[in-house]
Amino acid sequence: MSIHKVTARDVAERAGVSRSLVSMYLNRNPKVWISEETKQRIDEAIRSLGYRPNRAAQLLRGGRSHIVGVILGRISGPVASCFAESLMTRLEDAGYRVILGITRYEPERERELLESMMQLDVDALVYTLHPEYVEEPLRRCAAACPVFLAEYHPDHPFHCVRYDLGGALTQTAHYLAGRGVKRVALLTDSGGYGEREFLSVPEWEAAGMRFRSFRCGTALRPVTGIVAELRHFQPDALISFAGIDGGSLREQLGGSPLWIDSWSLPFMPLARSDGSIVPGFRAYVELLAEAFLEVMGDPGGATRDLLAPVRFLVPEERTAVREAMNNDPFFQTLGQGAVTWQCR
């Protein structure tokens, strides 16, 4: 007794639509508008018939797999899990399936996962780790599909995310000038993150402010190791980059300098246009997903930076932000101690 294999034609007959419409729906054709009621009928027909699309045939016909690969070091932490969930939600809304690869920070496993992603014919790859150890397989991936680095690595030939500091620094310069600040200490990482952008803002010089950069945050030069230098410089304000805890340094300096934290946007609750509040990190990932989708729509285009806007958290905002963060389930999973330094 032969078993009838369910086809797209069977789905079309059950849903009362044409076979071509079922095909366009399954392939997420962006040029075709389908009503929600029709989508529901097709989905119900697929479920009731147990239809399974032939991915290989879809790929041969359309030249695209509608799969995006995402490679992370781990997914157990709240930030990594929020990144993955938010990215998956937006990409799935756009008609893509997302396959996660977890490397556990093992270089050999990273290479194996990249090979697997290429065998799956992914339409794009989002890589959240440092590309140094896997640049060769990443280059081979990039020859077939867009490769996105979730951090800024300008020395590597891939699309990457760059924080847009210009507007935030200009606003901060006006804020500090209005409070009579004359000496600014820039707390940055060992690579001098943010120094170039800081120097490019003319408002610092126009307001007569002096600044000095303090590179810290490494085992050889911990944050606590610059307290004596800061006391000698006597800053009126601290601007901390790359997650450096300027709040604890401020306390060690007697609490007098203003503390401006530049690492706030990905973690601050943000208001959407409809008035709803979304966790800032989730909104940040949604911005990245929109940029990924734009580049995926033009896969042959030149490699470019995807700008992620940044704003600074000034002292007057901290109480309100603390309350919003403490009421946010995402930050409750981080634990109180992990977020206290963000909003002191």
Name the predicted role of every residue range:
Residues 1-64:
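N-terminal helix-turn-helix DNA-binding module of bacterial transcription factors
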Residues 2-3, 63-66, 70-178, 192, ...:
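Alpha-helical recognition/docking segments in bacterial nutrient-uptake
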Residues 12, 46, 91, 139, ...:
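A generic structural signal for well-ordered alpha-helical segments
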Residues 69-71, 185, 260:
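Short, well-ordered beta-strand segments
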Residues 102, 188, 215-217:
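Residue-level recognition of beta-strand->loop/alpha-helix junctions
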Residues 172-209, 299-321:
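An alpha-beta-alpha
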Residues 228-344:
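Flexible loop/turn connectors
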